[in-house]
Amino acid sequence: MVNWLERTELLFSKEQMDRLKNAHVLIVGLGGIGSFAGEFIARAGIGKMTIIDGDVFDPTNKNRQLTALDSTIGINKAVVLAQRIKDINPDIQLNIVEEFVLPERVWELLDEHQPDYVMDCIDSVTPKLEWLIACKRKKIKITIGHTNGNWAEVIKGDIQITDMILVPTLKK
């Protein structure tokens, strides 16, 4: 049987491949950015993923979301992406959370799943800020992705709360 990561292994050392295999990435928001990110991360050989989204597909998603198809209309985005990820890598450890994450749930989800990295691809500002605050306090690396019509932005690195907006309440 051919090693499906053979081409990836040409790019990375054994140590780097082991780091990927042992890493856990949590992606919240599986629409225009999150659906592509989830698939690309799975194809890189990540060992464990937690994918979170409470939304279901509707026809208007088809122009911009990887897993939005006629056959997936009305189905939860995390469930659909999970099937696709498992088709790519049947050995991946995959946690599926079918939930719109309220700000007060962010801390619980981080404690429950304990990811090494978080990719925030949600649209709502208040939960987005809570993910940023929680990850900063827990020293979890976070990347923030956001789209709005005709533009997209991905922010990584040392993001400060003041880079976004002022937060009305800080918890924990």
Each model region followed by its residue ranges:
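Adenine nucleotide-associated cytosolic modules
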Residues: 1-172
